Amino acid sequence: MTFLDKLATAQQTNGSLLCVGLDPEPAKFPGQLKGDASRIYDFCARIVDATAGLVIAFKPQIAYFAAHRAEAQLEQLMEHMRRNAPGVPVILDAKRGDIGSTAEQYAIEAFERYGADAVTLSPFMGFDSVAPYLKHQGKGAFLLCRTSNPGGSDLQGQRLAGIEGQPFLYEHVARLAQGPWNLNGQLGLVVGATYPAEIERVRELAPTVPLLIPGVGAQGGDAVATVRAGWRPDAPIIVNSSRAIIYASSGDDFAEAAQKAARSTRDALEAAKP
C-alpha cells in the first residue's frame, strides 16, 4: 500500500485529519518518567496506543530522539507503530536537504532504517536533492513551503525577480510540487496553520497535493481556519498537533489526557469541514 493509499484509508477509518506529533522531551515527562531519556520509547508508545484510533498519521521528530542518543528507541517506536497501528502512516519529520549522493543516504535512513511512510524535506538545494527520495516507490515526501515559524517569511515571503510574475518563494515551491517535480505523485507540502491565507493560496496553486499543516495547538494555529483554508474533498490535509496533545497532562494519566485532547482536536477539525 502506498503512502497516499494508507493516508486515505486512515482518514476514512478514523474519521480524522489529525496527525499527532511525537516530540519527546524527557524534562516534560510525567511522574516516574520525568527526566529519564531511557524512557522515551515508553512515553511515546503509550501516546501512540492511546491515540491510534483518532489520527490520520503520526509524525516523530527525529531531532528529539537524536539529541538524547535515542535513535534505537526511535527504531523500536517505528516497529511498535507498524505492529500496533498498522493502518496509520508515519511521517518522519527530518527536514533533510543535501546533495544527491548524501540525499540517497538520508532516503535509506528514512525509508529502510526507520521504515517511515513519508519524510519532510527542505527543497532549498533544488530538485536533485529531492529526487533520491522519489526513487522509493510508494513513499511520500513533504517539501517545506510556508512554515509555521515567524522567521519563515525571511526567505519564503520574498519575491523571485527572475521568474515570470515574480512569485513569492513559497508560491514557486507550491507550483513545483504540483507540477514538474511531482513525477510519481509522491510530493506534498508543509504549510503552517499560523498562516491560513497562505494555506489557501498554496491550495490554489497545488490543488491536489497533500498538505502537512503543523502549528495547531501550542503554536497558536486555529483549527477551523486551517481546515477551511486547505481542505478539499479530493485533496488531503494532515493537521499536526504535538505539545498540546502529548503534554496534555503532567500526571500519570498523561496517555488518557492525550487521548482526550486528540479526540477533541479531531472532532473540531472534522466539524470545520465546509
From Swiss-Prot:
It comes from the Bacteria. InterPro entries: Aldolase_TIM, OMPdecase_AS, OMPdecase_type-2, OMPdeCOase_dom, RibuloseP-bd_barrel. Pfam families: OMPdecase. Keywords: Decarboxylase, Lyase, Pyrimidine biosynthesis. Its EC number is 4.1.1.23. Pathway: Pyrimidine metabolism; UMP biosynthesis via de novo pathway; UMP from orotate: step 2/2. One of its GO terms (molecular function) is orotidine-5'-phosphate decarboxylase activity. PANTHER family: OROTIDINE 5'-PHOSPHATE DECARBOXYLASE. This is Orotidine 5'-phosphate decarboxylase.
